From Swiss-Prot:
InterPro entries: DUF716 (IPR006904), TMEM45 (IPR042127). This is Transmembrane protein 45B. The keyword Transmembrane helix applies. The gene is TMEM45B. It is a multi-pass membrane protein.
Length: 275
């Protein structure tokens, strides 16, 4: 959808997933470092998350196809292509839906090779970047530039996810991927505000070089904000788990002390009875 809602929708999807990852991966990492950690709960969490991502993708496809001015699953009619921009967006969502399904199969079916889920996710991100690269030809300079900046996050994420096929559960790669997904989500919102200003705000001059310079700088700010979100959530998870661990130790020590006091009192009573 070539409007504000058409960019806010995928932006919200990517932002929600990124924020969830910024909490999930630190939790998983710190649980791995502890003994007797309930890892089977994280497998269930992976399945639920993959199902949600698949649902988001299907919702995106339906939104692109069945909006009032959408193609309604018609690709070609009377010697004309129909709403190819909507079809490109639908194709992007389709690959992410496949990625979500493969993620679920990885944890539900034992004979699916480990790492296929990351490979398919890398392919989905690459396809998104590939589609965006040819998405903005013959557009005004600002329109081309603001979309092309997104390619850095997409192809960087593709490389990072591809490395996860080999280095699975690597916390640094997972957090790097998380930061790029958050960046992608916030940048979709930024594209919507720049190209389709809501609330009657003035439109941007798409041929002004100063606007190109500002948007480039703004992209850097967006990534700094994404890194800050990942760092803050990582720290909060660490502090929370550390506090819970200390609280649990305190309860265990208290119980042990009560047991030792009961044992001591029992010994005294036994000694007095013998006398």
């Amino acid at each position: 959808m070539a409007n504000f809602k058409g960019h806010a929708l995928p932006g919200s999807f990517f932002l929600i997933i990124g924020l969830c990852w910024s909490v999930k991966y630190p939790l998983k990492y710190f649980s791995h470092t502890r003994k007797n950690s309930p890892l089977h709960y994280y497998q269930r969490l992976e399945i639920v998350e993959a199902a949600i991502r698949t649902l988001f993708s299907v919702t995106g496809i339906l939104a692109e196809q069945f909006v009032p001015d959408g193609p309604h699953l018609h690709l070609y009619h009377e010697n004309h292509w129909i709403k190819l921009m909507n079809w490109q967006h639908s194709t992007m969502y389709l690959f992410f839906a496949v990625s979500g399904i493969v993620d679920m199969l990885t944890y539900l079916v034992s004979h699916v090779p480990l790492g296929v889920d990351r490979l398919v996710m890398a392919v989905a991100v690459f396809m998104e970047g590939f589609l965006f690269y040819y998405h903005v030809h013959n557009r005004p300079p600002l329109d081309q530039h603001i979309h092309s900046l997104l390619l850095y996050a997409l192809f960087g994420g593709c490389v990072s996810i591809s490395l996860e096929v080999i280095f699975r559960d690597h916390i640094v790669l997972e957090l790097f991927r998380t930061s790029l997904i958050i960046l992608q989500g916030t940048w979709f919102w930024q594209i919507g505000f720049v190209l389709f200003p809501p609330f009657g705000t003035p439109e941007w001059d798409q041929k002004d070089d100063a606007n190109l310079m500002f948007i480039t700088m703004c992209f850097c700010w967006h990534y700094l904000a994404a890194l800050s979100i990942v760092a803050v959530n990582y720290s909060l998870v660490y502090c929370l788990l550390t506090r819970m661990k200390r609280h649990g130790r305190g309860e265990i020590i208290g119980i042990q002390k009560l047991n030792s006091d009961d044992t001591y009192q029992t010994a005294l009573l036994s000694g007095s009875d013998e006398e």
